[in-house]
Swiss-Prot record:
This is tRNA pseudouridine synthase B. Transmembrane segments: none annotated. Responsible for synthesis of pseudouridine from uracil-55 in the psi GC loop of transfer RNAs. The gene is truB. Belongs to the pseudouridine synthase TruB family. Type 1 subfamily. Keywords: Isomerase, tRNA processing. It comes from the Bacteria.
């Protein structure tokens, strides 16, 4: 007779992990899910094993809103090593080209405006983007180069921090879909010396505060203590994933209607557009709705708590 499968917990919220170097985002996700004994978990955009920093992990009903964090702005601190290009554009790859570094701080400062604003970027071959149903990195590992189209990205900030040749430290605030490895590789080519990522740390996702992150060691200590209550207290609310959306408070009657997936008409939505967060009269988060024509809202992602 097969042993009955142990049921996990219906736990809901967003956990902020300070991801350690050397672990994949998917490995981290499965370990966090196991530690929380959660029925459902999902991360909000992978970090390379080399990278450290903020990795929001959605548990339970929060997974319905993970796409909002995938689409959110990100901030990074990156150390680029000038003079070397690698096949992965980071320190984990093989060096494919070495050049002398005759780059001054002023030359770097003069180059940065070229990469700010709305630009086009060709994704790295070592990425999870798919071609004919297979991730690009699988082609890359087989020595196959696939033609990739340049994609629009936005670099909101690209700030110089320090330069001690051959190491250049920058801070980046960017849109979704930005590959920092590609940005560094492109910058190295623009400077004429080549470059790759030596260190990468994600410092922010959306508006999540860095002081709410837990280190891997702290998480393991909670797990060893079997203190689920303390772990649960570290979770941020489900609606934190959509905190940038405007709030729309509903009446009791409207709350019941959206609970059944029905559209609700308002007299005046005060020029609200796009998507809104819905709350009940008791200030309970209900989900996200789309604002349509004639002041009608349509429930799109509703929580089931």
């Amino acid at each position: 007779m097969s042993r009955p499968r142990k049921r996990g917990r219906d736990i809901h919220g967003v956990f902020l992990l300070d991801k350690p170097q050397g672990m994949s985002s998917n490995d981290i996700l499965q370990k966090v899910k196991r530690i929380y004994q959660a029925n459902k978990a999902g991360h909000t955009g992978a970090l390379d094993p080399l990278a450290t920093g903020m990795l929001p992990i959605c548990l339970g009903e929060a997974t319905k809103f993970s796409q909002f964090l995938l689409d959110a702005d990100k901030r990074y601190q990156v150390i680029a090593k000038l003079g070397e290009r690698t096949d992965t554009s980071d320190a984990e790859g093989q060096v494919v080209e070495t050049r002398s570094v005759n780059v001054t701080e002023q030359k770097i400062l003069d180059s940065l405006p070229h990469f700010r604003g709305d630009i086009m970027q060709v994704p790295t071959m070592f990425s999870a983007l798919k071609h004919k149903g297979k991730p690009l990195y699988e082609y890359a590992r087989a020595g196959i180069v696939v033609e990739r189209e340049a994609r629009p990205i936005s670099i909101f900030e690209l700030n110089f921090i320090s330069y001690e040749a051959p190491y250049l430290t920058l801070e980046v605030h960017c849109s979704k879909g930005t590959y920092i490895r590609t940005l560094v590789d492109d910058l190295g080519e623009y400077l004429g010396c080549g470059a790759h990522v030596s260190m990468l740390r994600r410092t922010a996702v959306s508006d999540y505060p860095a002081d709410k992150m837990l280190t891997w060691e702290q998480l393991q200590q909670f797990a060893q203590d079997e203190d689920l209550a303390a772990l649960d207290a570290r979770l941020l609310p489900v609606d934190s994933a959509v905190s940038k959306l405007p709030v729309l408070s509903l009446s009791e009657e409207q709350t019941k209607a959206v609970g059944f997936g029905q559209r609700v008409k308002f007299d005046n939505l005060q020029q609200l557009q796009g998507q809104v967060r819905l709350f009940s009269p008791q200030n309970v988060f209900l989900g996200v709705a789309e604002i349509g024509k004639d002041n009608v809202i349509r429930p799109s992602r509703m929580v089931n708590l």
